[in-house]
């Protein structure tokens, strides 16, 4: 189910009056509800969230960290997930039936996740099985719908995050000769390349044309990349890197592996949001960095490291628009709905989908 389907089915819309409240009033009310509920309320926040939201997060992290935290939390009655829809789905699947997972704004989706739906995936699988036989194991980035995770779990595969993709790909190659990697071609390509797989041994599946694009024929294909991408990270270009180095040859460039292979290759380093944060934390004072990832995180890193010269690799970059739908008014409204006993934006993955999706998620967690 795409995020558009979710919106059509949902009446969980915040009243406009919340937008008229002062920031101080909203912060006071959020803090009061957090104090009232104590450990019965848990707020995980993704690194890409706004500061006005992240200040109230009980735990911040990337997709892998938040998935692991959600799985371990047994105390909270309500988990208010400050992230996007697929993350809240994952939290729902990893927590108990007695726990309620809430997304403050149901419009907080992920364009990448919507680039692979079940009809497209079933058609692709049928055609790829015809071409390659039973030699393929599917993997999906956690930035995917619960239905896609279920498909992958049903066919023996696992989910991956940008933190653990390399480990999961290594495991997958012990299971089958070939990998189908959904839905982000860039993370799949960059990870496979790091494992020593040549670009000519990778092919791209175009779901819009229902065709496989392989430069050197089908025989040597080891990785089949779904033609999807992150709309934020695709905006970092090789021109950004050339311009940055021309302006300052001493600057170090670190990017997220959702960037294109060309950008990753030209950069000094690449890794998950956690890896980027850890790298900057450990860097010496006075070091200079250009970071290729979402702007909210970059701005937060800049603020936290006044002793270093840090900037965005793309000076015209904007934050992730869907992630930014979770703002302070929506967080407050969501918490007050819980306080009234009428939680809105409840995320509930159907049992049949959940069972197969959990196979994929648990395989990932056991590998990493």
Swiss-Prot record:
Sequence positions that bind [4Fe-4S] cluster: 110, 230, 320
Impact noted for substituting residue 259 to S: No change in activity and in iron content
Annotated InterPro entries: NadA (IPR003473), NadA_sf (IPR036094), Quinolinate_synth_A_type3 (IPR023515)
Catalyzed chemical reaction(s): iminosuccinate + dihydroxyacetone phosphate = quinolinate + phosphate + 2 H2O + H(+)
Cofactors, names only: [4Fe-4S] cluster
Assigned EC number: 2.5.1.72
Enzyme class, first EC level, given as a word: transferase
Record note on what altering residue 318 to S does: No change in activity and in iron content. Cannot complement the deletion mutant. Lacks activity and does not bind iron
Keyword terms, alphabetized: 4Fe-4S, Cytoplasm, Iron, Iron-sulfur, Metal-binding, Pyridine nucleotide biosynthesis, Transferase
GO molecular function, one term: quinolinate synthetase A activity
Entry keyword Metal-binding: yes
Family: Belongs to the quinolinate synthase family. Type 3 subfamily.
Subunit text: Homotrimer.
Name the record gives this protein: Quinolinate synthase
Organism: Bacillus subtilis (strain 168)
Lineage start: Bacteria, Bacillati, Bacillota, Bacilli, Bacillales
Gene: nadA
